């Protein structure tokens, strides 16, 4: 099982190293046969190769079965043209692998309800996974344009585009609490009608998973009023963009949020947080999101669901007993990782 490691910039190398320590500890005990090769990416690749996603990295990604990514960007490269900034490497990476589904879990860990902006009794038990379609919808639909008098965009989805992201969501729900909520605007938009009908057709292949539908405006309200009711949520590109950001504030810290991007090529697993150049090299970065991204890799790239849950449980215990500085504790990157390993 080959993993391409892209540490990136800022705190990326530090938190990625923490995630690798956890993976290697599991490998030693379970004999997983994981192998790792590190490649330049983002600003680090610009410095060495003049571009954020060089050919050597592209080939490494294509030869791997999963990508573990750190973070990209920083003020050092902000003055560069937009097309060659570190962040453009992310778009190129996703496009090269045809990654059409983004998975963003938002979980309020037991004992950390106080961090959520919601009341503790509302935040308690929140564990929702947002599955967002990444490559279609209004962000990519044609025709699009703007004149002095008007502007226009096109919301468009084909049946295969909806079917494939729906299958990803149903599969994810099957590994969790077996409940999928599909979000659309079927009462106003034909695309929403089409989305709902197609998801219902896909549901026939997953009779063990419960399915319900929500309009996007109602869904935004429910995510604030009663987020614990949801298990897996699937939706289109623009609605997923908004709802995943809304859900991301529920745990109370970006340092807790992993993500996965899945598709036809090599899947990518990365923290939601940025490169945080202000704390890079200080040994205080919270590695939780990177470690949980590694857990998502075990589950979604290699099918090791039980091991992924063990990592999540170890992280939850470490967060409760020895939280890192951004969560009100004092455990630095190394110390927190040691605690995760101890609980693991």
Swiss-Prot record:
* Listed GO CC annotations: cytosol
Q: What class of enzyme is it?
A: oxidoreductase
Annotated GO MF terms: 3-isopropylmalate dehydrogenase activity; magnesium ion binding; NAD binding
Under the heading PROSITE patterns, the entry gives: IDH_IMDH (PS00470)
**Pathway, per UniProt?**
Amino-acid biosynthesis; L-leucine biosynthesis; L-leucine from 3-methyl-2-oxobutanoate: step 3/4
> Assembly and interactions?
Homodimer.
What is this enzyme's catalytic activity, as reactions?
(2R,3S)-3-isopropylmalate + NAD(+) = 4-methyl-2-oxopentanoate + CO2 + NADH
Keywords linked to the UniProt accession: Amino-acid biosynthesis, Branched-chain amino acid biosynthesis, Cytoplasm, Leucine biosynthesis, Magnesium, Manganese, Metal-binding, NAD, Oxidoreductase
Q: Which residues bind Mg(2+)?
A: 217, 241, 245
Can the keyword Magnesium be found in this entry's annotation? yes
**Biological process annotations from GO:** L-leucine biosynthetic process
Species, as recorded: Thermus aquaticus
Q: Which Pfam families does this entry report, sorted A to Z? A: Iso_dh
E.C. number(s) listed in UniProt: 1.1.1.85
Binding locations of NAD(+): 74-87, 274-286
This entry's comment on the bound cofactor is: Binds 1 Mg(2+) or Mn(2+) ion per subunit.
**Identification of the protein by name:** 3-isopropylmalate dehydrogenase
